[in-house]
Amino acid sequence: MRRFDKSYAEAKRKIDNGDIGKVVLVRSYTQDPRSTIESTLKFAPHSGGQYLDMCVHDIDLIRWFTGSDVKNVWAIGGVFEFDLYKELNDADNAAATIQMENGAMGFMFTNRTLCRRLQR
């Protein structure tokens, strides 16, 4: 769970202390590098789909940071590179806009086609 990572815990502390104001939008990007695609494709039939496999942590953070539950979700995705995802009714790139019960918003982008590893 990402909420136990020091940087996310610090952001939550700042939210709770009122240091950064009211949270109206939480934006998240979860991307798998193309260099790990072999193992990702092997796991894909058992993963439950990109949102369940990758975005469960993003959804948790959006709920945690906004202090609210999800009211509505609009999602779109596509297969742009790896045809196996078509067979699984999944996507290799997907995005979702989330409306929270308290009016806050969330935006998630996820993909399995990142050209290089992200610097941390």
Model-inferred region functions:
Residues R2-L88:
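Predominantly a Rossmann-like dinucleotide-binding segment in NAD(P)-dependent oxidoreductases
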Residues L25, N93-A95:
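Broad gene-expression machinery/nucleic-acid interaction feature
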Residues V79, L84-A91, I98-R120:
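NAD(P)-dinucleotide binding in Rossmann-like oxidoreductases
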